[in-house]
Amino acid sequence: MATQLTTRARRATRVSRKGSQPASKQDVKQVVKSILGQSLEHKRANLLLPPTVVNTTGNIYCLTQFVIEGDGISQRTGRVINLEQMVLRYRRTLDTTSANSGFLRYIVFLDTQNQGTLPAITDVLSSLDVSSGYEVLNAQQNRFKFLLDEVESLCASATNLSKASTLTFNQKVQVHYGGAADAATSNRRNAVFFLELSDKVATGPQTRLGVQLKFTDA
């Protein structure tokens, strides 16, 4: 059967100004890709992290490891997914007891070389400072692919005490897993992470992050 399909594909023709010509392999691939794309089931998964205080030690979260293996609409059937869209709803509020303004940095990135770990913030940045550059060794090896890197101020005033953003990423990427569970040990190539860091030693800003993923099984 496979031989017959291959033979038919090779004999497929297309119409051009000069008449009928054999279809190229690229033409056949595009047709097959289109048919398969229409038949794939698109899945969605949501994650809502609890309110968190951000200080000079920072926080880092994996945004893809919560997609566990299973048969549900929010689960994956194997060890690879095609991530098509990621929407982040990020809210941050300066602590009301703080009389001084503060800076907050947040970064969204892929770990292209992950092997079952949660990276340390100092794997990403050269120091625990809002103005720090990227850690040089991992930057040299192109370990991380950065999708967003922002620094903003939260002022101790009624006009700039809180901020909220909806961040949409439509970059398509294959995310790999090494296990079935929601655990750091399941993280593999192209796991997506969120890093947040402030310049407040104490009474840092409080943040909350909601995540929605749209994906297909690979």
Swiss-Prot record:
This is Coat protein. Residues 1-26 are annotated as: Disordered. Its main location: virion. Keywords: Capsid protein, Virion. One of its GO terms (molecular function) is structural molecule activity. Residues 8-17 have a biased composition (Basic residues). Coiled coil: none annotated. The keyword Phosphoprotein does not apply. One of its GO terms (cellular component) is viral capsid. It is found in: Virion. Pfam families: TNV_CP.
